Amino acid sequence: MFKDVDIKFVNKEITPFGGLSLFFKMLEKCGYDKVLQECGLPEQGSNRGYKPWQLVMGLFAGVWCGACKFGHLDLVRYDRVLSKMVGWDVGAGHRAYQRYLNKFTQATNQKVFGHLYKWFFDNLVFDNYTLDFDSTVMVREGDQEGAAKGYNPRRPGRNSHHPLIAFVSDIRMIANYWLRPGNTSASTNYLSFLDDTLENLNGKKVGLVRMDSGFFSGGDTRLSGIQEVEIYHCL
């Protein structure tokens, strides 16, 4: 009934995440490590600290392995094969990621992610984008930074965030993302968000902008602001 299975011990280190080598090769082919070194990542205060690009790559590896909390990033540290795949002697612990991410400010985020967005779209051989804008509600439990009470159909009265998202549907790629308090509406400061998004696209032609009626709750003045931008159609 049962088949015989060959069981033996080996001295070789193994990992269930060997497929990630393809992702790392892709990033290497794109020159992503050089881009990280040029995008203005915060510097470490100690010469014993992990290099910024190593922490970013470790964060990528952790997310690709299924990490959804900082504590899960220790998986990358203790998987020696995974560390060797990216050329590390040893990976960082999860507290190293927490300490490093605390160095980011709003200005730093704008500088770093603006550079990364421009690099991505510069290397994308595609033009005449369809740009979609949308907002959503993210329910927050406990006392989270920036969370506030506002429109929340799933959990009325609970704190939430109300992020604003721009994405290019043609290539299924996020073009911009702002995390906002829950007491904001869809149209709150969205013209600045549009300007920031077009700057991320770095000269690419936008043939169509799509957004729902919530973005025009401020009246015709907001619509006229949209029309001043070089966009061919707006729905």
Q: What name fits each language-model region?
A:
Residues L179-L235:
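An internal, acidic/charged active-site-proximal segment
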